[in-house]
């Protein structure tokens, strides 16, 4: 997650873009995977997920509540100066997302957002499935960039799920074995 994530434009995330949007996300992950090989001392990716103000308010609130429940930063390492407030009744959201399990709550989130005629934004979906220990630092409106709603996140590189690591990091090494010569070759993620 970096400002590169903002370069995956809304039209590329659209479900109407079909496989073109999926390739844009794959290219983003492949680039981040390559970065971990070339710069093996990188421990964290810090960045943001962006949602557009045109997104359904209740759908947005469900996503933000879900993210905070399952990835919220309990240590309060970072907080927005002017956090975006959820408009939907929190008790209703609490009753809706009533499971301790990410998987069970995710099924509910996906179903409820689809009932509104929307999908969970692809980048949000992608980040949630990258690491079970992702941290979410809250959301704020970026008034200088079209009033988009930006949610701060942190992902520990060594906690990226194995299937994602294989797909986006190890695949880079197979295609570019010379990249391991840039470092000692003892990559902390690949030798995990």
Where are the regions that the model predicts?
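Single conserved hydrophobic/aromatic residue that forms the stacking wall/gate
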Residues: 1-9
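Non-catalytic substrate-recognition and accessory regions of acyl/acetyltransferase enzymes
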Residues: 6-7, 149-192
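Conserved acetyl-CoA-binding loop-helix of GNAT-fold acetyltransferases
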Residues: 18-35
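A short, internal acetyl-CoA/4′-phosphopantetheine-binding micro-motif in the GNAT/acyltransferase core
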Residues: 10-20
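Conserved beta-strand-loop-alpha-helix junction that forms the acyl-donor binding cleft
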Residues: 15, 46-56, 115
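Conserved GNAT acetyl-CoA-binding A-motif
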Residues: 36-50
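C-terminal accessory regions appended to core domains
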Residues: 116-123, 128-142, 148-155
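A conserved mid-domain beta-alpha-beta active-site/ligand-binding segment of alpha/beta enzyme cores
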Residues: 73-124
């Amino acid at each position: 997650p970096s400002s590169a994530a903002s370069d995956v434009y809304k039209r590329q995330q659209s479900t109407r873009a079909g496989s073109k949007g999926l390739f844009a996300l794959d290219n983003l992950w492949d680039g981040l995977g390559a970065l971990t090989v070339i710069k093996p001392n990188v421990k964290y990716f810090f960045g943001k997920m962006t949602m557009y103000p045109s997104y359904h308010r209740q759908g947005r609130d469900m996503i933000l509540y879900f993210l905070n429940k399952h990835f919220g930063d309990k240590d309060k390492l970072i907080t927005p100066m002017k956090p975006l407030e959820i408009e939907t009744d929190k008790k209703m959201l609490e009753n809706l997302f009533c499971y301790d399990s990410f998987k069970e709550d995710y099924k509910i989130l996906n179903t409820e957002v689809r009932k509104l005629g929307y999908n969970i934004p692809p980048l949000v979906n992608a980040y949630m499935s990258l690491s079970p220990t992702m941290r979410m630092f809250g959301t704020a409106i970026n008034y200088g960039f079209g009033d988009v709603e930006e949610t701060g996140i942190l992902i520990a590189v060594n906690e990226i799920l194995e299937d994602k690591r294989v797909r986006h990091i190890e695949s880079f090494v197979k295609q570019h074995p010379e990249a391991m010569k840039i470092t000692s070759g003892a990559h902390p993620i690949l030798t995990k």
